[in-house]
Swiss-Prot record:
GO terms for biological process: formation of cytoplasmic translation initiation complex. The keyword rRNA processing does not apply. Gene3D superfamilies: 3.30.70.330. RNA-binding component of the eukaryotic translation initiation factor 3 (eIF-3) complex, which is involved in protein synthesis of a specialized repertoire of mRNAs and, together with other initiation factors, stimulates binding of mRNA and methionyl-tRNAi to the 40S ribosome. The eIF-3 complex specifically targets and initiates translation of a subset of mRNAs involved in cell proliferation. This subunit can bind 18S rRNA. It comes from the Eukaryota. Residues 1-28, 157-188 are annotated as: Disordered. The lineage of its organism: Eukaryota, Metazoa, Ecdysozoa, Arthropoda, Hexapoda. This is Eukaryotic translation initiation factor 3 subunit G. GO terms for cellular component: eukaryotic 43S preinitiation complex; eukaryotic 48S preinitiation complex; eukaryotic translation initiation factor 3 complex. Residues 190-268 form the RRM domain. GO terms for molecular function: RNA binding; translation initiation factor activity. It comes from Aedes aegypti. The gene is eIF3-S4-1. The keyword Cytoplasm applies.
Amino acid sequence: MPALDEIKSSWADEVELDSGSLPPPTEIIENGQKIVTEYKYNKDDKKVKVVRTYKITRLVVPKSIAMRKNWSKFGDSSNDKPGPNPQTTMVSEDVYMQFVSNKEEEQKSDNALDSLKNIAKCRICEGEHWSLSCPYKGTAYEAGKAKPVVPVQQEMAPTTAKSGKYVPPSMRDSQKPGMGGNPRGRDDTTAIRISNLSEAMTEADLEELVKKIGPHSKMFLARDKNTGLCKGFAYVHFKSRRDAATAIELLNGHGYDHLILNVEWSKPQNPQ
């Protein structure tokens, strides 16, 4: 009986068997270049060949960088060769760090201070500083720079009466010929005092109240220093005593802003 011939597989079966494996990548180094050939499947599930060409350059680097390149890799890259793997690592341009000192900033601040020196000028020694911080302040140098002051005639010494009583300064001028007893030199004989005014009283309201009676020379509305409200009284100086008497006659007992006004002659502050 003749021997059975060995059954050989067809070419289609061989292609089917080889379709699941890819050739291993190859590297060729020549003329300062490294040529890497790889095989992979594209989107259409077709086998393609990828060829990458790298230019080999040699750089002098510190020992620490060279040691880091020889570190053992781990994970999916445990079998990779030393250096970056082009499939997983993209090498970009080197970034060099430059450490700048603060000398430039200090120089800029010094220039700014130098420009401010010309602003301040001392009036005592004409130096480049304020007069308040002048080292010659209160010394003989400042006294020599001061302008001469015209001497003022000294006033007469305060006199005392024969009875030995103290005479206030406001009453001393009344003893001199031609001098009145009013310290402020005003005529209070035409002044009236209006009291019982409301807190909301203003100078405009006071002007409206007395302007129809007669011309006046001055008005004073007393106000509180803290609140600024009216204290309840005011003074009006008329130009004639007749107008002042008419104002007392008309306004005394007159109702204004729900209050009854009290108007009388202004009493002198220092009666003789």
